[in-house]
Amino acid sequence: MYIIRCICLWMILGLMACSGPVRIQKNLEVKPEIFPDYADVTIPPNIAPLNFKLKDACAEARAILECGPEKLEIKTGKDACFVIPASGWKRLLRAASGNHLNVTVQAFVNDEWIAYAPFIIKVAKEPVDGWLAYRLIEPGYELWNRMGIYQRNLENYTENAIIENKMSGNNCMNCHSFCMQNPEKMLFHMRETYSCTLLIDGDKVEKLNTKTDQTLSPLVYPSWHPSGKYVAFSVNKTKQAFHMNDRNRVEVFDSASDVVVYDTQKHEIVTSPLLSSEGAFETFPTFSPDGNTLYFCSAKSRTMPKEYDQVRYDLCSVSFDPATRRFGTVVDLSLIHISE
């Protein structure tokens, strides 16, 4: 009896896997509407399967992915999604590296099989770093106290927590940043309970109190210097307000902000009047790849929140000497200048 059951099972699986091509009654000139829209995008050769869903209603659908002799046919499964098997996907990407995949979607609509115009997915030769770190939080302000910093393997979508705020009194944690994508050298902020900035360098962990009498707030938005010796930060007086009638109910704004640079070795903060003026909101600093230029955004200061809709940020830059920690004497306002 056991042998008969096994034979029946294998026959069923074989029929499902070898259902064969369908007879197409109509070929469309339009590409299918899919979600997410992967048509004509470029992907790295080590990305996890790009599962997608056909937006048009249909009783059944198939997708044929191919590159040269490599071919993969899949049918829609639960929730009308195309779930691409990992092994077949990897074979396709190896074959398509530096080239592209052809994707043809067929659907059974109104008692006939139709074929959409094919689309392509370009495959680069160069792989990407296989890990992505991000903060995960509910998309509303009500549940802000449930959050964590997570990492995801982009090659298979495995996700695990770096730290969750249930470990620290459900406080806010944010602005995690890695030095040149080095997972051994990073920082992030803890707010309210256990308020601090945690600076991690290998096995060394420093807990920093970054509020000073000379700065507006503890350090906020970070950008590592490529040397790892410095981190540029904004310091912000940030507030939240609620609109009565606007569709965007929540407005988060700065009433003041400056830019500073933190020396991780000397534990000192340096700045310049060009980066910390009362007449402007300076924020969002970013070091250039060579570390000799500091980019930042700057807007003329306004009375907030009354004039929130009049704030216009320019993209600016100033030179920075890593050896002396000195800034240039002139700010370049020509990058993107939209303020009055």
Label for each model-derived stretch:
Residues 16-17:
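C-terminal motif of bacterial Sec signal peptides marking the signal peptidase cleavage site
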Residues 34, 113-141, 214-215:
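Low-complexity, Pro/Ser/Thr- and charge-rich linker/hinge segments at domain boundaries
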Residues 132-143, 233-254, 296-313:
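Short, conserved, GDST-rich strand-edge loop motifs in beta-rich repeat architectures
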Residues 133-208:
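Conserved, compact domain cores that house catalytic/ligand-binding motifs in diverse enzymes
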Residues 150-152, 200-203, 251-265, 311-322:
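Beta-propeller blade signature
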Residues 180-182, 226-227, 289-290:
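Residue-level detector of Asp-centered blade-edge/turn motifs that repeat once per structural unit
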Residues 336-340:
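Conserved small/polar residues in nucleotide/adenosyl-binding loops
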